[in-house]
Every structure is written in structure tokens, then in C-alpha cells.
Amino acid sequence: LGVAPSATLYPIVSGCSAWPPAGGWQLHSKLAIAGGAVGMNASWTSGEGTAHGYQASERTHDLMVRDGDFDTPAAEPFVVVFSAGNSGPGASTLTAPKEAKNPIVTASGVNFRAGSIDNISGFSSRGPAVDGRLGPTIAAPGESIASTKRIAGAASCATSIAGTGNRYALCSGTSMAAPHVSGAVVQLTDWWRTLNAGATPSPAMLKALLVNGAVDMGTADIPNANEGWGRVLTPSSMGEGVLREYRDQSTVFNATGEQQEITVGIPDPLQPLKITLVWTDAAGA
């Protein structure tokens, strides 16, 4: 059923012969926005290799998160969830364009079928980015995931699951992990709209919710270059059982040097305090 079984999927550029698309990478977000989508799952690579650094494709995807349709006068924020790539376990093996700043980049963890859910997959691409920034953003199960299987052409998954008519198989890869996070984004968007009179959370808020609720997988203290900020845990992101305060773009800065000071009261000094600050950054040069 997936993480968000009631969500509406909107396939875009399926079977496109040109890569990147003839209309540029932003064709993805433009078509998705036209279909009413809040974001996209991007379980693919641009084909520009690993340790690509920050170049044109990374810059374009940073722009897409800030504004998914360059051709309209108003900015239309758009969530991009990427798979980290399957070039691990070496350092700085994120596949392009996953060294962009604004997308949510997903590492793969082991599924219960394959071992401990708190182990990172050996194949999962690692950070850091070439310029030293942290990557990936977060992790999700991506190993031995029950998924639909191609019924023609080369198979990319393991042996079919018995009793499924050769239509389902156990598949592994960060391409399996990223949809878990995309499903969490859908759940968090629906939850946020319910609490905020239908308002859609910004891409930065959604990333903040995911990061704040993530749990350490035990490979090293988070954040780290294997799992980012940890394994996604949606109930924790929703703040179940703890006091929470959220601020989503309530103050807009208009000039360099502007500041905002926020005072937070701590009701129980014996309990941990976790603060997450995320912003959708301007694209680099």
C-alpha cells in the first residue's frame, strides 16, 4: 500500500527519450505543479557521476525548490525528494545532482527483511558534498522492499514474490528509500493543513519536520555522512507526546543583517530540547 496509500500520484515525463528533458530539468516541477502536486519523488540521477560538486544541474534544482515554475510571476515552492544514489560505501559518492542544497536527499537503510532497520545499506551513497556540506539529508528503508516489477525488458529487482503473478519483487536501492520519504512528506502536508486552516507547509518546514523527528540509526552520532540526520519517523515529526512550537516563514527578512530573536520557555528542564532551523537557500553561482 505504500506510506501514503490515499495520496494521488501524478506520473510525469514517463518514457521521455531525452535526458535531461528537452524543456530542461524544471519541466518536471512545472508539469507536477500543473497537476496539483506539492512535490516530486526523484529516484534517478542526471548521469553526471559522483562527487559532481555544485554545478548547473544542482543550481537548477535549488531554484526549483524555491520556485517550481519560472514562467509564472508568483513563486511556487516545490518539494524535491531525491535518492542519494547507489555508489556507496565510499565517502563523497552522492550521485548528481544530489549535492544541491534545497532538496531532501535520502539514504537507504536495511529493511527488517534483510536485517536491522538501524543499519545503513552498504550500497547507499555517502556524503559529504565536495565543498564539505553535509549530505544526505535523511534515511529510510531501501533494502528488500516489496515493489512492482517490470514485466518486460531487463529486471532491476530480485526474484519475484511468490503468488503475485510475477508482478512484485523484493527490490533494493536508494530509489526504494526515497519514496518512503515522499510518502512522509504527503502525510506531513495533510497533517499540517489540518492544523493550519488548509495552509501548505513550505519546503523548508517539511524538511525541518523530517529532520527534527528523525532517529539515530546507530552508525555514528547524527548528523553524519551515512544517514544524514537519521531514519525518518513520521509520528515523531508530528510531535506525538511532546510539546512543540512551529514557525513557518512568519517573519520575512528583506535585507542583509536583519535579525530575529525568539525566546522559548522550557516547562521541564530535565527533558531534552531539540531545535531545528531550516531555510530554502538561494541558488549558488
Per-region residue spans from a language model:
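Active-site glycine-centered loops adjacent to acidic/histidine catalytic or metal-binding residues
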Residues: 61, 85, 173
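Catalytic-core regions built around general acid/base machinery
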Residues: 57-77
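Extracellular low-complexity, Gly/Ser/Thr-rich intrinsically disordered linkers
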Residues: 1, 28-39, 44, 150-153, ...
